[in-house]
Amino acid sequence: MDRLCGSGELGSKFWDSNLSIYTNTPDLTPCFQNSLLAWVPCIYLWAALPCYLFYLRHHQLGYIVLSWLSRLKTALGVLLWCVSWVDLFYSFHGLIHGSSPAPVFFVTPLVVGITMLLATLLIQYERLRGVQSSGVLIIFWLLCVICAIIPFRSKILSALAEGKILDPFRFTTFYIYFALVFCALILSCFKEKPPLFSPENLDTNPCPEASAGFFSRLSFWWFTRLAILGYRRPLEDRDLWSLSEEDCSHKVVQRLLEAWQKQQNQASRSQTATAEPKIPGEDAVLLKPRPKSKQPSFLRALVRTFTSSLLMSACFNLIQNLLGFVNPQLLSILIRFISDPTAPTWWGFLLAGLMFLSSTMQTLILHQYYHCIFVMALRLRTAIIGVIYRKALVITNSVKRESTVGEMVNLMSVDAQRFMDVSPFINLLWSAPLQVILAIYFLWQILGPSALAGVAVIVLLIPLNGAVSMKMKTYQVKQMKFKDSRIKLMSEILNGIKVLKLYAWEPSFLEQVKGIRQSELQLLRKGAYLQAISTFIWICTPFLVTLITLGVYVYVDESNVLDAEKAFVSLSLFNILKIPLNMLPQLISGLTQASVSLKRIQDFLNQNELDPQCVERKTISPGYAITIHNGTFTWAQDLPPTLHSLNIQIPKGALVAVVGPVGCGKSSLVSALLGEMEKLEGVVSVKGSVAYVPQQAWIQNCTLQENVLFGQPMNPKRYQQALETCALLADLDVLPGGDQTEIGEKGINLSGGQRQRVSLARAVYSDANIFLLDDPLSAVDSHVAKHIFDQVIGPEGVLAGKTRVLVTHGISFLPQTDFIIVLAGGQVSEMGHYSALLQHDGSFANFLRNYAPDEDQEDHEAALQNANEEVLLLEDTLSTHTDLTDNEPAIYEVRKQFMREMSSLSSEGEVQNRTMPKKHTNSLEKEALVTKTKETGALIKEEIAETGNVKLSVYWDYAKSMGLCTTLSICLLYGGQSAAAIGANVWLSAWSNDAEEHGQQNKTSVRLGVYAALGILQGLLVMLSAFTMVVGAIQAARLLHEALLHNKIRSPQSFFDTTPSGRILNRFSKDIYVIDEVLAPTILMLLNSFFTSISTIMVIVASTPLFMVVVLPLAVLYGFVQRFYVATSRQLKRLESISRSPIFSHFSETVTGTSVIRAYGRIQDFKVLSDTKVDNNQKSSYPYIASNRWLGVHVEFVGNCVVLFAALFAVIGRNSLNPGLVGLSVSYALQVTMALNWMIRMISDLESNIIAVERVKEYSKTKTEAPWVVESNRAPEGWPTRGMVEFRNYSVRYRPGLELVLKNVTVHVQGGEKVGIVGRTGAGKSSMTLCLFRILEAAEGEIVIDGLNVAHIGLHDLRSQLTIIPQDPILFSGTLRMNLDPFGRYSEEDIWRALELSHLNTFVSSQPAGLDFQCAEGGDNLSVGQRQLVCLARALLRKSRVLVLDEATAAIDLETDDLIQGTIRTQFEDCTVLTIAHRLNTIMDYNRVLVLDKGVVAEFDSPVNLIAAGGIFYGMAKDAGLA
């Protein structure tokens, strides 16, 4: 390099230590300034160029119009290029004229000139790629200015020293160059205008990050405006920025889906290759081990999806880790500087500045790393939620039965969140070993081979912690199973809460949940104890390493002296070593939890999907809309086929009826046409779009209009036609908001008939080619059914000309169909036109002979008129066929099955859909819909975010839940461990000063022993505090869950009608998870960072009292940042919590309606809807992540200032301080940055997580029902004895502010009397039963049973003495015994007797498990009739004096109806029976009939008298053919 600089007047050496270091006026040689210093910016730009160009090529952000700013920057670049060339030409000029300039004067202008040309071109290329602020060029210009400052000073000092300017030309060009690069730096700090054609331009509220300048992005200053806004007022949804394109769900999910698809393809190829025959020998085949089927790896799919983010974060993390080792080296030099009185003072100031600069750079890069990794974590969670949602849309029905909604919601809420939680620790897998290796390397440099002793400690402790983590994983797996069971049970309880209240069964289910919860908490406790042991091991590890290393060092050789430099540089290295070791427990815990979640998610994603090719859409015979050729179908591969060898051809435009007995496969046939069943063989072809009306009407939680439109654009004419033909116009007049009325979850505020008609209107509006109608007429009365058939389905209806497949029970419409398919035993037994089937004289004709007279008379007469010849033919045929007699077993059985299936049309009102929902919706009509508002028709209340500070009462509640003594003990233990840590370090400082004061170290054993004792004391106190926290946290988790559970079980029915179950489940899943597993570690980390911060300030002030001067300003700045941050982050967290519930509510709703969604081809629309809800959640999550980074940069700046001032004051007071105190002070200062950051973070996290307590407490304090038992007013033993029921001037409303639904009702029912209750929909029939059980409380008046006012006794004393057979026969998952007798009060003989009387004993006896037969969720594995008989058995077991039948037989077949009515007449002969009836024939022999009309008693007399009077009841009886 010296030759490069030449010799002579302008020549110099490249480096001169006396000039640059060992002097009080340091400078660099001209050669160094003109060469390496000038080249540094150029080297940087050329090094960064390849990666930057690659980035720009793959990130087109738009096009920026040429602006004055761009022109100025370009002009400056050109001028700098010119200045460099002028310098170069001047050197050539000198060479020509014989002055022989040094080579550096040719090389440097050439290098700088080319680099300036590159910078100029880069300015324009960035403009074309839409870059508003270039970080690469800002750093380049900054380096140019920094590297030019030294020559700037040197040239002036040289000119002053020499009295003249040695090289006036280069002197002038340099200052021109300096002025230009300084201007370029200033201009580059200003950002360009937004680019054209950018998506950001269309955004009304874009995230400012996208257009922020380089320094703003580096320091997260762009977040400041939102922080100020959040400080001034609570943030709202409208304040949140839109998501950038790359963060949106549709982008992120698609990337993961593509990666997952590749994994599936690879796995399938691997299996195919394994399965290929290679013609081996017989022995080889027999002896060869069976190859394991290779499953696609979800982990690999995740890694491939987020590779770029992982690599970017790894780069940031690597730089940050390397920078972490700079300050210990600077500390070493600083201590040596303090020890050397002859060292120049500027060394100390330079060291202080370098320590500040190093810390600041580390801060900036650290938070770029965190931002990168947390944004990746957010995208990861979004992608996993999206993939789970998409999978749920296509899983088979058998998988749906295995994976309940609660379990799938857990995958989304808990398991996806765990991946997000563990993501920030992923890089520890490689960075922790790197940091440990580097720390040990530097320790070796200081302490020599003694450092290996510390390595040995680490190596020995790793297996111990590994064993602990494996045990933790075992507990984690078990705990998640209990969590799933608890959530599943809670989901069932919430969906069947009304049944539990009516039967007074809440205590039984309460105990079930508490039992599961107890098991879950036991595993949590064990896991937490193991976590505490793991924490103890790793907290003690750095200290043990320090102790043993220093002990070995001083004992291995007497000449080894522990001085301040060795002690505190080692200590700072050990503190660095402590970070990865302390994080390892969290990493292990997080990875353990994530591995469990990974397996759960992977297992779910590998479940079977419906075959999209099951139904062919193109190849079909001409003239036909639907064909099935040799079709055999099953619901699951491991189950026998449900439908066998079907051969069906349905012409275009035909109306086809499907009839048959119970379980024959009618609904299965519709499902097979939809592709919902698994096809074993055959071909199914469907040509055209499909509309589907299921047995169980699926209604969304949105407005009635949105339910009908179902995502299609509004066509007013078609919409009006759909409402009119489906008889919905009259309902719109009653609904508070008309068609804008919000329909509650699962259509809870509509009657069964209204739900079915909305479902039918959706189909009509869809204007599809093919309509699959699964029994849509069973849920409406006879007149409405006739209207719908005539106006919609029939030959003259709006669907005339469309292909219609109608599953039906009634026979009055069959003559108008084009042909009929009769199913029996999963096969087509007969098929043909109505008249042809009559001529065939099979089971269909036999059924008509027996049950046609029971049909509605008017409808039957119409049928006779329309098919007179067919009926005459029927009479003739039946009279001549003697082989169809009842003594033929096969024929009799078919007839019996038909009898079970066919139901007479209802006489009035609307009945519930014949197939009960899987989840309990609401069996009782909602005449006055409980929570409607007249103005808006909104039912579900919006979840409101709390604002302002979290109330101190919430913290107090949690502290009390933990136990006040426990809370106080934890704080004292943490304070004690901090004191022990300070004591150990102060002792180390004194030990290191022994060598300074005495030249050697005496009392080494004492020094080492005390140091060891203090360290061990610290470790023990940490472990004690962790164990104490476990005790308190588990107790708090138990009490808070218990309070929530008890309150919700006791909440009134109106609460469940107005609150989505997803919102309640969110409390039991996500919020309880936070209380269980997140809150306690957060508190421990807060205490740790708080005491560390306090102890650091105390040590620094004690070491350098001058530091007191800056403590107050830094504390003010710290408090200022903290107040801004906490206010904003708290509200962002609340908004995130509020926006999370709709994701799960929508998911639950989607899973129950997948068949409808698929049938209408709306899968893509629902994906978009789910993505929208997830994106809305991300809109609050992303600013929350940014707020943490904003906090980190600003707080760590305060911490860096602490480092700066600690070092500066050490330099200033070097004459009065010993090296030990300086080492102690600065080493503590180096820790304070992280401690201050974590303290605010943990304060905020505590506030964010304590919101879970707030939300749980909120739902633990909602209004409850009356007490279950009033000890001071218990009902007499054996009450009621007679069963006399009186309503005295009774009025009721659903809630304050609404109209009365029953008005001044006065009714007296004698004991043992049988009373039927009838009336049109909305008359108040079911309201009476709600009042009798006190589901609704009186507005005025009273109900008296056997002389006792029911309002004066406990709810369970009342409800347990009444019996109801509800319209919806709800069963719960569990044994049949539990569903009959949840309290275990009855003997096995009693239960079998009840089963015998309810005609279920044959079925139960045939089951291998008998009474322990496992009922599926909702009783899904039993038929509707069987479920209703179970309800009858419940009533027989209870055998109370008052029995209520709430339309109990409206949705079941005739035979089951006959069985129930016969049993009721015999077994409840002496009981009071109140029957809400739709089938008037069931109450014609009752003592009296109560007719309600608009909430008042219209008629009340015997059936005979009421018919004779010719009033409302007479009209109903006439409609039913009974008068």
From Swiss-Prot:
Protein name as annotated: ATP-binding cassette sub-family C member 3
Annotated function: ATP-dependent transporter of the ATP-binding cassette (ABC) family that binds and hydrolyzes ATP to enable active transport of various substrates including many drugs, toxicants and endogenous compound across cell membranes. Transports glucuronide conjugates such as bilirubin diglucuronide, estradiol-17-beta-o-glucuronide and GSH conjugates such as leukotriene C4 (LTC4). Transports also various bile salts (taurocholate, glycocholate, taurochenodeoxycholate-3-sulfate, taurolithocholate- 3-sulfate).
UniProt-annotated binding residues for ATP 2: 1319-1326
Positions on the Cytoplasmic side per record topology: 57-75, 124-129, 192-301, 367-419, 463-535, 589-967, 1035-1071, 1118-1191, 1241-1523
UniProt cross-references to SUPFAM superfamilies, sorted A to Z: ABC transporter transmembrane region (SSF90123), P-loop containing nucleoside triphosphate hydrolases (SSF52540)
Extracellular side stretches: 1-35, 97-102, 151-170, 325-345, 441, 557-567, 989-1013, 1093-1096, 1213-1219
Tissue: Detected throughout the gastrointestinal tract, liver, lung, pancreas, bladder, gall bladder and at low levels in the adrenal gland.
